[in-house]
């Protein structure tokens, strides 16, 4: 979820045949090989850019106050090493900025290779890069984030950073991801549950990927409605803590001073899309602000 303003600088389009990253005039464009089912097909990260340029394998869009970038990483070799290298470079590029949000798309994310799930391999590489950069205090620098599966053979990493130091938020009903026990892998996921960056004239609210988790356990296996209710409860908790409870209800945006809000809903089982849309519309009056 994001609440943003100003002109587009980085467009992310879903439903592509393969991952593609390119510069078009002053806008960076990322096309993702992720199935698109409903809602807006393109998401724009808006920062009123003063430049759009390549820096090695990263395409960057920059304004006075924000830096947005993306890279494609070949994931056919040892995933830990590839991810560590990409994140080390990302953290180098973002030196002098504060990381707000990272979107991560990992091919074959739940496959087991070499005795370890690929998402856990990904976490090892990401953690190693943060640890090398920030040392034992690495948890203080972890942004909001999400990691989901994607087609193709490339890991896609998109980040947003800013000049203003953000406030990091956790969900009191969930264990912080970076404190997950060892049963979830040699290194835990590295992210905050949410981030708010506020200046005198604008406020950005960025929510991490959220699921039906209580504590550190998934709940509602096989029960779609319980999973949905638990997930939305977690989202509502976080939005309340970050001071934007109205973000889910477009009819209240004008009154609450929200210019724009957008959510993405990732479904492992696409056949439940009609149910999810029905539930969201019943709760919030519309689901026009959701991409599926």
Task: Describe the function of each predicted region.
Residues 1-292:
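N-terminal presequence-like segments and the immediate start of the first folded domain
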């Amino acid at each position: 979820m994001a609440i943003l303003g100003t002109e587009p600088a980085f467009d992310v389009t879903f439903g592509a045949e393969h991952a593609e990253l390119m510069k078009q005039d002053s806008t960076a464009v990322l096309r993702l090989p992720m199935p698109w089912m409903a809602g807006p097909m393109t998401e724009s990260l808006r920062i009123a850019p003063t430049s759009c340029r390549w820096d090695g394998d990263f395409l960057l869009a920059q304004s006075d106050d924000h830096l947005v970038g993306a890279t494609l990483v070949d994931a056919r070799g040892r995933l830990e090493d590839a991810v560590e290298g990409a994140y080390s470079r990302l953290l180098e590029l973002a030196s002098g900025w504060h990381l707000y949000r990272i979107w991560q798309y990992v091919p074959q994310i739940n496959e087991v290779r070499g005795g370890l799930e690929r998402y856990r391999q990904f976490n090892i590489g990401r953690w190693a890069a943060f640890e090398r950069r920030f040392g034992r205090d690495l948890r203080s620098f972890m942004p909001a984030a999400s990691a989901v599966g994607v087609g193709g053979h490339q890991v896609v990493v998109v980040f947003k950073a800013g000049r203003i130091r953000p406030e990091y938020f956790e969900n009191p009903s969930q264990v912080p991801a970076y404190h997950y026990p060892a049963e979830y892998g040699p290194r835990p996921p590295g992210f905050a549950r949410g981030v708010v960056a506020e200046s005198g004239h604008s406020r950005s609210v960025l929510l991490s990927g959220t699921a039906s988790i209580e504590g550190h356990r998934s709940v509602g296996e096989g029960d779609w409605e319980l999973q949905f209710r638990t997930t939305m409860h977690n989202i509502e908790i976080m939005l309340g803590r970050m001071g934007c409870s109205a973000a889910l209800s477009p009819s209240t945006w004008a009154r609450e001073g929200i210019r724009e809000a957008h959510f993405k809903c990732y479904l492992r089982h696409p056949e439940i899309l009609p149910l999810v849309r029905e539930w969201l519309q019943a709760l919030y009056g519309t689901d026009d602000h959701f991409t599926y």
